[in-house]
């Protein structure tokens, strides 16, 4: 039997059930485990209670229960500089960012990893639903989590080979109900705690209110692609490509009652374009361009790739051809795709292996750029 007692694993503990069970499993496997709570955002709810304080109490209770030391580390400045400023800049540019991708890249597997090294860590572990496999030569591959509903490789797609070398995902082979079962059997205080949802720094707050407290909203015209005036929008940043509803327009007199969708944005003219029908022509595209393209393995500067891709979390994979040039790529779809959204991640897969990904810049219909500018 392997003696893990000399291998130190520092676990990122959020106060949720997933990271609690991660720490428990590693402790049971004999590792030298330390728990660390990351405070990334100064947050108080409507009653003036800091939700991070409550989460830290749960971390402390779980750590005491399973018998591991624990620390708290403050990454508020790093989070603001590396994740939140990016989030605001993307919305300013009329895009729809994915802060979770950036948080994993910059905070959980960079700032936290660096901190863990000061504690003498051999590895860091988190409660993400993903798996890693290690080749004989030490190369690490990232694989989808066994629970298809929970697989989080989409959000981990910007991790480098160097980061993956130091990572463990103990929940990767488990289904979520089994994780709760383990927590309940061990009597962990977090066993029945509900999963957190949404963007971590917004929490349960109204998204519109939150965004408008940081970025001024500018109202403007709402139009169809063929130029019909449809009234006024409340600010382009509040709308995302493919969004249904929230525009204040229902069935039009003398027209059909098909639902309305956001089909485009013109930032320079401050116009929101809308259209009827889920598969409205303006929502369909045949390719995209991406930047900040990155692979988990060391790859040449220029190459082509035939693989599958996801353009948003929890969507089925689609077959694509990828032409990579440095940190940029053109991604050509086998079948037209709906509502490709600038700012979101495009993530590449070969079977169950997550190869990497990038951030979507623009979508195209044949050679023509879609109206997402």
UniProtKB/Swiss-Prot annotation:
Pfam families hit by this protein: tRNA_Me_trans, tRNA_Me_trans_C, tRNA_Me_trans_M
Entry keyword annotation includes Disulfide bond: yes
Gene Ontology terms describing biological process: tRNA wobble position uridine thiolation
Site entry: Interaction with tRNA: 128, 344
Function: Catalyzes the 2-thiolation of uridine at the wobble position (U34) of tRNA, leading to the formation of s(2)U34.
Family per record: Belongs to the MnmA/TRMU family.
Name the record gives this protein: tRNA-specific 2-thiouridylase MnmA
Organism whose genome encodes this protein: Streptococcus mutans serotype c (strain ATCC 700610 / UA159)
Taxonomy of the source species: Bacteria, Bacillati, Bacillota, Bacilli, Lactobacillales
This protein's encoding gene: mnmA
């Amino acid at each position: 039997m392997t003696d893990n007692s000399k291998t130190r694993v520092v676990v990122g503990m959020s106060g949720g059930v997933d990271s609690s069970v991660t720490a428990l499993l590693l402790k049971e496997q004999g590792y030298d485990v330390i728990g660390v709570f990351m405070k990334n955002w100064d947050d108080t709810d409507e009653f003036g209670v800091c939700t991070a304080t409550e989460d830290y109490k749960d971390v402390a209770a779980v750590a005491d229960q399973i018998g591991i030391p624990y620390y708290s580390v403050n990454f508020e400045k790093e989070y603001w500089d590396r994740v939140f400023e990016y989030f605001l800049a993307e919305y300013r540019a009329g895009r729809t960012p994915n802060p979770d991708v950036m948080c994993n890249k910059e905070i959980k597997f960079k700032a936290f990893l660096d901190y863990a090294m000061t504690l003498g860590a051999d590895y860091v572990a988190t409660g993400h639903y993903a798996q890693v496999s290690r080749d004989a030569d030490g190369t690490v591959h990232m694989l989808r989590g066994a629970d298809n509903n929970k697989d989080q490789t989409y959000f981990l797609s910007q991790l480098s080979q160097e980061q993956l070398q130091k990572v463990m995902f103990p929940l990767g082979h488990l289904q979520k109900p089994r994780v709760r079962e383990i927590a309940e059997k061990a009597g962990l205080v977090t066993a029945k705690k509900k999963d957190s949802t949404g963007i971590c720094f917004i929490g349960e707050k109204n998204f519109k209110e939150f965004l408008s407290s940081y970025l001024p909203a500018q109202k403007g015209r709402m139009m169809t692609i063929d130029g019909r005036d449809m009234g006024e929008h409340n600010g382009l940043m509040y709308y995302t490509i493919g969004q249904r509803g929230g525009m204040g327009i229902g069935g039009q007199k003398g027209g059909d009652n098909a639902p309305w969708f956001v089909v485009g944005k013109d930032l320079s003219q401050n116009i929101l374009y809308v259209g009827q029908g889920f598969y409205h022509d303006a929502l369909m595209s045949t390719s995209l361009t991406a930047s900040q393209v990155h692979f988990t393995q060391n790859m040449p500067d220029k190459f082509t790739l035939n693989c599958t891709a996801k353009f948003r979390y929890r969507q089925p994979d689609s077959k694509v051809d990828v032409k990579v040039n440095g940190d940029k790529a053109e991604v050509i779809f086998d079948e037209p795709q709906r509502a490709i959204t600038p700012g979101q991640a495009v993530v590449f897969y070969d079977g169950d292996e997550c190869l990497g990904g990038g951030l979507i810049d623009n979508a195209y219909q044949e050679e023509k750029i879609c109206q997402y500018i």
